[in-house]
Amino acid sequence: MTARMISICGLVMALMMASVLASSSRFQRVPQSQSVVENESVKFECESTDSYSELHYDWLHNGHRIAYDKRVHQIGSNLHIEAVRRTEDVGNYVCIATNLASGAREASPPAKLSVIYLESASVQLLGSNRNELLLKCHVEGASGDLEPLEIEWYRNSEKLSTWKNVQLDQHRLIIRQPGSEDDGLYRCTASNAAGRVMSKQGYVYQSSVKCLPRLPRRKNEKMMESWDKQTFLCRGKRGGAAGLEALPAAPEDLRIVQGPIGQSIIKEGEPTALTCLYELPDELKNQRIQLRWRKDGKLLRQVELGGSAPIPGHSFDSGKDALLREDARLVLHKQNGTLSFASIIASDAGQYQCQLQLEAHAPINSSPGILEVIEQLKFVPQPTSKNLELDAVVAKVHCKAQGTPTPQVQWVRDGENTTLPDHVEVDANGTLIFRNVNSEHRGNYTCLATNSQGQINATVAINVVVTPKFSVPPVGPIETSEQGTVVMHCQAIGDPKPTIQWDKDLKYLSENNTDRERFRFLENGTLEIRNVQVEDEGSYGCTIGNSAGLKREDVQLVVKTTGDGFAPEESGGDGFLVTRAVLITMTVALAYIVLVVGLMLWCRYRRQARKARLNDLSTKEAGGDQPDVAGNGKGSEQEPCLSKQHNGHSKSRSKSSGDAQKSDDTACSQQSRASKKSAHIYEQLALPRSGLSELIQIGRGEFGDVFVGKLKATLVTSPSDKDADTEKQHSNSENGSGGSGSGSTTLSTLNEKRRSKTSMDDIEEIKEEEQDQHNQSGLEQLVLVKALNKVKDEQACQEFRRQLDLLRAISHKGVVRLFGLCREKDPHYMVLEYTDWGDLKQFLLATAGKVNTATAGSSSPPPLTTSQVLAVAYQIARGMDAIYRARFTHRDLATRNCVISSEFIVKVSYPALCKDKYSREYHKHRNTLLPIRWLAPECIQEDEYTTKSDIFAYGVVVWELFNQATKLPHEELTNEQVVQRSQAGSLEWSVAEATPDSLREILLSCWVSNPKERPSFSQLGAALSKAMQSAEK
């Protein structure tokens, strides 16, 4: 009995323990099935409800215990898998919870892991005959448990959809009754959460040719080894065979270790980098080897790896399309071959591949990588409200959205997802179409654009209106007697109800500006005038309008006085009066036309005669040696901005010539004499266009393209010679052409030359000019060429002349020289001095390591020291002081508009590349591109440019120098915010951290709001000179 009781008690205790274990082993969180993109990480969560016992967790994969490593590890009770691999990690995962006290174990339900990947796509031909063409898009990839693969078909880059004889059936493309309009290259794209790929090869269909290239239909049959080269061979009637000339393979030890892998998905605006690790053997380092990056088969960036210096302008594949455009966002690192993007934009999406090219050998290609850009969801453009004309047959409201993936566009009315009204539909492009517009179509319509990023909306108001029309228009002319009464009718219909406004001689009439006792405005729009006066005579206009538009009708009121004998019975003579008035008017008009034509012919004859006399006189004075520069040229007849050229040089006239010209001067205005003077100045600057060579476009400015090229050294005149020639001509004009004045001319030339120097350093100025003369003994001079393309834009022409006069009037080593002006034909070229190191901003970025400028056998330049920065700022101050002393203003002073040479000589220049290269540094304000972050407040508010505003910009330039030009001034603010704060006087400036203490106060004074309190360039130069001396100590 006792034993039986003991067994019963043991059974009860076991049941109780089992119940406790069952309750304690229930899971609070169980692992969930997941689908993840390959190479991404995943986490399985597992947690038991038993918080009183010590538990141990294990994980099983497909029934086997997991061996943990760095990639697959357990944190607490959760399982973490880094860089998921589809070949190893796919399957079921089970969490095992073990009670260490009792040894009881509990298993969670299995969780399935599916891997999403996308490798490649190819087009396969399933069948082709006259009645049907059947293609299949074969994809190597999987979408897991998410949405299936999305397949898109393209013909010659045009996206196809089910239409007419084209049918899309899952992965297949069916074209029934194919014809010549279906000819082209067919390719397909596949996309899922892992990205998007396009078939590397396509299928070419051509209905009119019997020999068609065919894709292989067996998987083991090889395509071309190079994915970016496709050659289809077709033997013609003559039996000729096409082929490619093979190049020898590169050495095996020259190879690419790692290229861009798989597919990268980057959000718009984020930075990224593409890897290209390579091995370069020592025996090949002295040979020509190029590292290239290609995008969609086109050359994007390249760099020389070998020791041999590259030939300028030469490339191994110069005949191929290239995308070698200057873009500060893209940097190719020579050391490791990485292609880095500072910020991604939508156009960067594509297929990238790096390549090693040994001269005269076949290229070595890496595996291609796909860069997909997630474009921000936005409307392009924003939908706007619209007025629709009642009973219009068709009216459209557009709604276009962009984003990644492609957004779906739909319309709803009044914020509710209800059915649109009758005769309103939405086409495939998201356009809202109204047919047979009626009043029921009024309301608020919302456009919804949706993709995986979310949803955006824009609401527009649709109003149905009726264009105003005259139901009773004013009819005239109206004649009335003085002190009579006249009624001018004007009634209108429309929806909304039109308003009616009267005016007299284009001046609005209302009860406030008229005599209320005589003028009466009726509710229906009629104007009644009582007790008509003589001054009431004139042209009266009635304007009707509503939100749909405006219309106007005029009526003439004629007031007859009592003395004119106006009476109703005399109206029969009105016909004769009208006829006489018409005859008189026509006679006067004909006489005026004859007079104008006669004056035009006379002026043209006088101008040609005067031009002939000037040409003859110039030829005689030059001894017959001067060629006809532009007198007979076609280009000079069509110069819209600059004064026309004249033959030879303007010199002194003899007394008889002056008497012959005296009569012409009486017919010429002061403006024509000024035009002759400017023409003489431009003629001195004339350069033949044939002297320019190797022009390379580096950007676009406000009035045209900007180039860098070379100028024959024989055409470069030293500044001293130019000044002496000019001074000699002025002396001859004043003192006559006799030889006795040569001594005084030379003396005055030297004195004028010394006076033209700035007061900072005359001795260094003379040395600089002597060095320039010595340098001109070479064959060619590096120059900057600015083209005047906008010849019909008066503002652009005026700015072109201003820059020309500015650089012509200054001879200083701190300002670039003006070599000349090419005016033989359009466009005109302004030829300026340029340096071997280019613009200062790019130099600063290179020394800061932001731009890769390393060439073969060299390294990146080191950052500038404080002494070097002060030397650069001092030279710019000297150049700006020279501009100030010549009574000019620069208006666009910045590091981008200065140049630096390999001798560390800095000069103030004027490239002004505001349209592409430095477009971020300009903002369109009042219909003009302005460097608002460098402008003083008075320039933005009142368009007032002075030397003090140049000093304001100079302070910003020094700020750029100490920051190595790595960031924009106030880059945390938008352009609109900078303009608003500058106009409000709330834009705060502070000097750079590396600025010496001795310069902080004077630099801060450059930015004070009162221009009179800003320092001068001479004061800034003196402060910089002291700072340089202190830095040297």
UniProtKB/Swiss-Prot annotation:
<feature type="modified residue" description="Phosphoserine">
    <location>
        <position position="678"/>
    </location>
</feature>
<feature type="glycosylation site" description="N-linked (GlcNAc...) asparagine">
    <location>
        <position position="524"/>
    </location>
</feature>
<feature type="domain" description="Protein kinase; inactive">
    <location>
        <begin position="692"/>
        <end position="1028"/>
    </location>
</feature>
<dbReference type="InterPro" id="IPR013783">
    <property type="entry name" value="Ig-like_fold"/>
</dbReference>
<keyword id="KW-0812">Transmembrane</keyword>
<dbReference type="GO" id="GO:0042803">
    <property type="term" value="F:protein homodimerization activity"/>
</dbReference>
<dbReference type="GO" id="GO:0048804">
    <property type="term" value="P:imaginal disc-derived female genitalia morphogenesis"/>
</dbReference>
<keyword id="KW-0393">Immunoglobulin domain</keyword>
<feature type="glycosylation site" description="N-linked (GlcNAc...) asparagine">
    <location>
        <position position="444"/>
    </location>
</feature>
<feature type="glycosylation site" description="N-linked (GlcNAc...) asparagine">
    <location>
        <position position="512"/>
    </location>
</feature>
<feature type="transmembrane region" description="Helical">
    <location>
        <begin position="582"/>
        <end position="602"/>
    </location>
</feature>
<keyword id="KW-1003">Cell membrane</keyword>
<dbReference type="InterPro" id="IPR011009">
    <property type="entry name" value="Kinase-like_dom_sf"/>
</dbReference>
<keyword id="KW-0732">Signal</keyword>
<comment type="function">
    <text>Acts as a calcium-dependent, homophilic cell adhesion molecule that regulates neural recognition during the development of the nervous system. Component of the repulsive Plexin signaling response to regulate motor axon guidance at the embryonic stage. Also component of a receptor complex that is required in the adult visual system to innervate the lamina layer; specific targeting of R1-R6 axons.</text>
</comment>
<feature type="compositionally biased region" description="Basic and acidic residues">
    <location>
        <begin position="720"/>
        <end position="731"/>
    </location>
</feature>
<dbReference type="InterPro" id="IPR003599">
    <property type="entry name" value="Ig_sub"/>
</dbReference>
<dbReference type="InterPro" id="IPR013098">
    <property type="entry name" value="Ig_I-set"/>
</dbReference>
<dbReference type="GO" id="GO:0017147">
    <property type="term" value="F:Wnt-protein binding"/>
</dbReference>
<dbReference type="GO" id="GO:0070593">
    <property type="term" value="P:dendrite self-avoidance"/>
</dbReference>
<dbReference type="GO" id="GO:0030424">
    <property type="term" value="C:axon"/>
</dbReference>
<protein>
    <recommendedName>
        <fullName>Tyrosine-protein kinase-like otk</fullName>
    </recommendedName>
</protein>
<dbReference type="InterPro" id="IPR007110">
    <property type="entry name" value="Ig-like_dom"/>
</dbReference>
<dbReference type="GO" id="GO:0031290">
    <property type="term" value="P:retinal ganglion cell axon guidance"/>
</dbReference>
<dbReference type="GO" id="GO:0007155">
    <property type="term" value="P:cell adhesion"/>
</dbReference>
<keyword id="KW-1133">Transmembrane helix</keyword>
<dbReference type="GO" id="GO:0050839">
    <property type="term" value="F:cell adhesion molecule binding"/>
</dbReference>
<keyword id="KW-0597">Phosphoprotein</keyword>
<comment type="subunit">
    <text>Interacts with plexA; component of a receptor complex that mediates the repulsive signaling in response to Semaphorin ligands.</text>
</comment>
<feature type="compositionally biased region" description="Polar residues">
    <location>
        <begin position="655"/>
        <end position="673"/>
    </location>
</feature>
<keyword id="KW-0524">Neurogenesis</keyword>
<dbReference type="GO" id="GO:0030215">
    <property type="term" value="F:semaphorin receptor binding"/>
</dbReference>
<dbReference type="GO" id="GO:0005524">
    <property type="term" value="F:ATP binding"/>
</dbReference>
<dbReference type="GO" id="GO:0046982">
    <property type="term" value="F:protein heterodimerization activity"/>
</dbReference>
<feature type="glycosylation site" description="N-linked (GlcNAc...) asparagine">
    <location>
        <position position="429"/>
    </location>
</feature>
<feature type="disulfide bond">
    <location>
        <begin position="276"/>
        <end position="354"/>
    </location>
</feature>
<dbReference type="GO" id="GO:0005886">
    <property type="term" value="C:plasma membrane"/>
</dbReference>
<feature type="glycosylation site" description="N-linked (GlcNAc...) asparagine">
    <location>
        <position position="417"/>
    </location>
</feature>
<dbReference type="GO" id="GO:0090090">
    <property type="term" value="P:negative regulation of canonical Wnt signaling pathway"/>
</dbReference>
<dbReference type="InterPro" id="IPR036179">
    <property type="entry name" value="Ig-like_dom_sf"/>
</dbReference>
<keyword id="KW-0675">Receptor</keyword>
<keyword id="KW-1015">Disulfide bond</keyword>
